Each structure stands twice: as C-alpha cells, then as structure tokens.
Amino acid sequence: MALPDWLTFLTDSEEIIRTGGLILICLIVFAENGLFFAFFLPGDYLLFLAGVFCGTGILTVSLPFMLFCIFGSAVLGSLTGYLFGKFFGGRLENRPDSLFFKKKNIETTRQYFLKYGSRVLIISRFLPVVRTFAPILSGMIKLDFPHFMTYNVIGGALWVVLLSGSGFYFGERFPGIINYVHYIILFFLAVTTFTVVRAYLNARKEMKAE
C-alpha cells in the first residue's frame, strides 16, 4: 500500500531540507525526539544531510547557528517527551497498537533502561525509535528531573555535533557528495533498520529470559 504524499514527504530528508530549510529540520527533530507518534521521522540522516547541505552552501546558515538550533530542538523535544511520560504515561501504556504507536517500542526502550540505566538517554540518541521513547519512559518512571536534563543535554550535544558536524565537514571539503545524497540515505536506512531489528530481538530475548 502506497504511503500518503504527506507521509512520504516527512520521511524524505532531502526534500525536507530543500523545501523547509532549517525551520522544518528543527520541527522534525523536535517531534522525533519526544512525540510518541513521530518515531518514524528521519533523525540521524536528517542531521547528517543538514550538515552536508550547510557545508555545500545549499542551506544558507552558519554552522554554529545551525548546530545551536538543532541542538535546542532536540533538547526541547526530549523534555516534552519526559513531561508527557510523567503526566500521561499510564494512558500511553494502555493505548492499543496503531500505525503510529506500538507497545513493543516501549518494551524495547524499557529493556535498554534496565541494562544501561540513565546512560540510555545518551546512547538512545543514536538509536532510532528508542530515541523517541527514552525521554517518555524517563518521565513514566519519574526519573529525577535534574538528572534527566543533564543526560538530555549531553546526549543532544553529542548527537547533533557528531552527525551534523561530520556532514558539514564532508560537504565543505567534498562538494560533489551532494550528488550521492540518495546513497547516503540508503546507507543510514540500512544501519537504522539493522539497529532497530537487533534492539527489538535483544529486548524479546531478555524478556523471555526473565
């Protein structure tokens, strides 16, 4: 079944950057980092491509300004997820599965919390889906707020600087990389799919072991 046009657009990083610029990038990052129904949005490769487009001059903003805006969006998105989990988390766990919500995503994230503790708030920045649900689950378990914000800020900074910064480096030094955007997206999609499937299988294995 073909995806609706608006959903296809929201999952196309290149189109997001070319059409909406930094404003739309920030909105996507905000949503993907804390709104449970936005877990499918592009994250890692959107940040990398934002850096590439900034480095090649297609995205006409300075690198520091872009990093600051995306970092702020990531932190605020996770904060929103934390507050949602704290006040409405119980309703979310009782919510039936749908296209934009799967209970298995919460369980996968819960297993990461059991294994890594609060450090998952840093690790999860580089794990699609878990990145969306980690702050929500933090709120659900009433994680100490200053503790949450510390890991939120550190994780957000590492995620944005490493991905967008490396994208800028390649875009500035190798402008021709812009002709291989689709291959970059395919690479990130492959890594993302592998990571998500592996995380889900590990979570199921650990749940059965209990």
Which residues are covered by each model-predicted region?
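Transmembrane alpha-helix interface/packing and boundary motifs in multi-pass membrane proteins
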Residues: 26-47
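Transmembrane alpha-helical segments of integral membrane proteins
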Residues: 159-171
